[in-house]
Design a protein with these regions (language model features):
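Flavin (primarily FAD) cofactor-binding/catalytic cores of flavoenzymes
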Residues: 1-162
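Conserved small/polar residues in nucleotide/adenosyl-binding loops
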Residues: 166-167
Length: 167
């Protein structure tokens, strides 16, 4: 399963869960599984561990090497029985449904260009991108962007002439 499809940790109660990844989604999924009673949670990282002092039944290990039967075997030789494997391996923004002139194209995810207040597309005020910032106050930022967007749609906030503003 990919973290994109993760909805409820309840289904992992009493199970040995292996989480592959070492960023926000992996942390969230691993802790949810632990909180809802997973028998064990093993977090496999590829580059750097998250480095937290994990609760009992949670462990970080270096890089999955292979799967054999129902075991996850890691590069350091550690083996963990796996009832479930959850991939928290990141994602790429992809907008195949938009024409090229409307697609956000940037490697800068801290403050993407051409988005007024980080949301409204400069060349078309009816197009709004939410959640484009990369891992910076993520969920608080999503909430703020949703409220801002709501107020723009309800015409409580007026968008200035963006052709006069360098974004």
């Amino acid at each position: 399963m990919h973290s994109h499809d993760f909805r409820d940790a309840e289904e992992f109660r009493g199970k040995n869960v292996v989480v592959l990844g070492s960023s926000y989604s992996a942390e969230d999924v691993a802790l949810q599984c632990h909180k809802y009673g997973a028998k064990s949670v093993t977090i496999g990282y590829r580059h750097n561990p998250m480095g937290f002092k994990w609760p009992n039944r949670m462990k970080e290990v270096f890089h999955l090497d292979r799967l054999e039967d129902n075991k996850a075997i890691f590069k350091d030789g550690y083996e963990q029985e796996a009832d479930a494997i959850i991939l928290c391996t990141g994602y790429l923004h992809h907008f195949p449904f938009l024409s090229e002139d409307l697609k956000l194209k940037t490697g800068n995810r801290l403050y993407p260009p051409k988005l007024y207040k980080g949301v409204v597309w400069q060349n078309n005020h009816k197009l709004m991108y939410l959640g484009m910032q990369d891992q910076f106050h993520t969920f608080n930022m999503f909430d703020c962007q949703a409220w801002f967007t709501r107020d723009v749609i309800m015409e409580k906030i007026k968008i200035p002439d963006l052709s006069l503003i360098h974004i």
